[in-house]
Amino acid sequence: MKSVEDLEDKNVLVLGMAKSGISAALLLHRLRANVLVNDANANQPQELIEKLENKGIRMVLGEHPTNILSQNKIELIVKNPGIPYTNPVLVDAQARGIKIVSEPELAYWVMDSELIGVTGSNGKTTVTTLIQLMLDDNKKHAYVAGNIGVPATTVAQKATAEDKIVMELSSFMLAGIDRLHPHIAVLNNIFASHLDWHKTRENYVNDKMNITKNQTKDDFLVINWDNTEWQELAKRTQAKVVPFSRQGLTKSGAYEIEGKLYFKDELIMEADEIGIPGEQNVENALAAIAVAKIEKVSTAHIKQVLTTFGGVKHRIQYVENLNGRQFYNDSKATDIEATQVALRSFKKPVILIAGGLDRHDDLDRLIPDLEPNVKEVIVNGETAEKFKKIAQKAGISVIKDSSRVSESVEIAYQDSKEGDIILLSPAAASWDQYKTFEERGDEFIAAVQNLHKGE
C-alpha cells in the first residue's frame, strides 16, 4: 500500500460517519494520523462506536461544533460526500485554508491499482458493475468501489498492483478531489441534477468534469457523444477521447447502428441480446464495451457478460410476476431523467408509484412520458401534490394518495389487471421519508413479497 502524503501525527477530521467515514477513519489510524470523527447524528450503531473506540479513535457526536477545528488543531478534513460545503465547519475550514477532500480522494492516496472512474447523472452503477464483470477474470481481479456502496478506502487497501478498481463517483465525491487520477474515466451523461446541493448547473457540470482534470495524454475519457453539450465537454480533457453513441453519431468508439452494437469496425452483438430492458441499457452497454475494448477484453467475454447480466438492485429491478402483474423497483430514480428512462422501457400499461423529497424540479418535463402508457399514478412524499397536478395534465384519470411505498404497493395491486406493470420510480430523492433510496426500494420489495404470501 503506497501513501502519496505523509499523514503520520497529522490532525485529521473525518466529517460524517456512515460506512465510508468509518473506513476512512480506520485507514487514517493505520497511517498513524490523529483521527477525530464528527457526526451530527448521535444515534450511531454501538458496534461502530466500539470499533472506533477500540482503536483509540475519538468521536464527537450529536452536533458539528463550530470550534472543532481550532480546538483540535485540524490540518486535514475527509468529508462525507453528502455534507455540503455550506456546512459551518467546512466554511470555517475554507477560511482557514484547511484542505478538504472526499473519501475516494483519500483512497487514491494509498491505491496501488489502476483506477477506472465512472460518473454521470444516470446509469453509473450499471456501467460500473458491467465494467467490473468484464474486467474480472481468474488471473486478475477487478473491484467495484465508491458510490456503489463499497467504501473506496476499504477496496484500496486490499487491491494489488495487478488488480483494477472500478469506482463509481458521484458529483458530491468529485467536488472533493485533488490528485485522484483515473486511467480511464467514463462520463455517461449529464442532466440537471442535485441543484439543491450544487446551487447552479454550471457547478454541477464542473464537479462532474473533475473526473478528468488530472488525466494526461496517456489516459482515456470514454464519453457519451449523443448530445452536443457533452461533445463540447470532451474538449476540456487532455486524455484520449473514446466516444460512444446509441445514435450512431461516431464510429471511432462504441456505437449502435440498426440494432447492432459495434466497437470501431468490429461487430460485438445484437442490441436485443442485452439481458436487461430499456434503451438506456444499450447506452450503458456501449460505455462498458468501450472500456472493455481499451482494456483488451475479448468480444466473446463482453457478449457473455451483457447477455447474462440481470441488472442492479433498485435500478429498474425486476422483482416478481404476481398473477400476471410485473413489479419493478426503480427506487434509484431520484431525478426526473431517471424516471423518464424507466417509463420509456415499458410498452404495457403502467401503474406508477412516485414522489419523495421536493427539490423543486420541473415535474412538467415528465408529462410526455406519462401520457403513452401510464394508467394510474399513486403518490406519496413531499412532491405528492405536484405529481397529482402533472398527472392530471397528462390526462391520467386515476390518481391516488398513499402514506408510504408499502401502502402504494397494496393500492396498485388492488387496482391492477393482468398484463400491467407496477413500477416504483419516484423521480425524487428519498430523504423526506427514508434514510436512503435503498431503504425505500427494500420496502417496495418487502411489500410485493407480502402480497405473494397473502395469495
Curated annotation (Swiss-Prot):
Reactions catalysed, as given in the entry: UDP-N-acetyl-alpha-D-muramoyl-L-alanine + D-glutamate + ATP = UDP-N-acetyl-alpha-D-muramoyl-L-alanyl-D-glutamate + ADP + phosphate + H(+)
UniProt keywords, alphabetically: ATP-binding, Cell cycle, Cell division, Cell shape, Cell wall biogenesis/degradation, Cytoplasm, Ligase, Nucleotide-binding, Peptidoglycan synthesis
EC assignment: 6.3.2.9
Pfam families (UniProt xref): Mur_ligase_C (PF02875), Mur_ligase_M (PF08245), MurD-like_N (PF21799)
GO CC aspect terms: cytoplasm
Entry coiled-coil feature ranges: none
Pathway(s) of this molecule: Cell wall biogenesis; peptidoglycan biosynthesis
Protein localization: Cytoplasm
Binding-site positions, ATP: 120-126
Entry's Gene Ontology BP terms: cell division; cell wall organization; peptidoglycan biosynthetic process; regulation of cell shape
Top EC category: ligase
Example GO molecular function: UDP-N-acetylmuramoylalanine-D-glutamate ligase activity
Location, primary (coarse class): cytoplasm
Family of this protein: Belongs to the MurCDEF family.
HAMAP family registered for this protein in UniProt: MurD
Reported function: Cell wall formation. Catalyzes the addition of glutamate to the nucleotide precursor UDP-N-acetylmuramoyl-L-alanine (UMA).
Cross-referenced PANTHER family: UDP-N-ACETYLMURAMOYLALANINE--D-GLUTAMATE LIGASE
Name of protein: UDP-N-acetylmuramoylalanine--D-glutamate ligase
Species of the source: Pediococcus pentosaceus (strain ATCC 25745 / CCUG 21536 / LMG 10740 / 183-1w)
Upper taxonomic lineage: Bacteria, Bacillati, Bacillota, Bacilli, Lactobacillales
Chain's gene name: murD
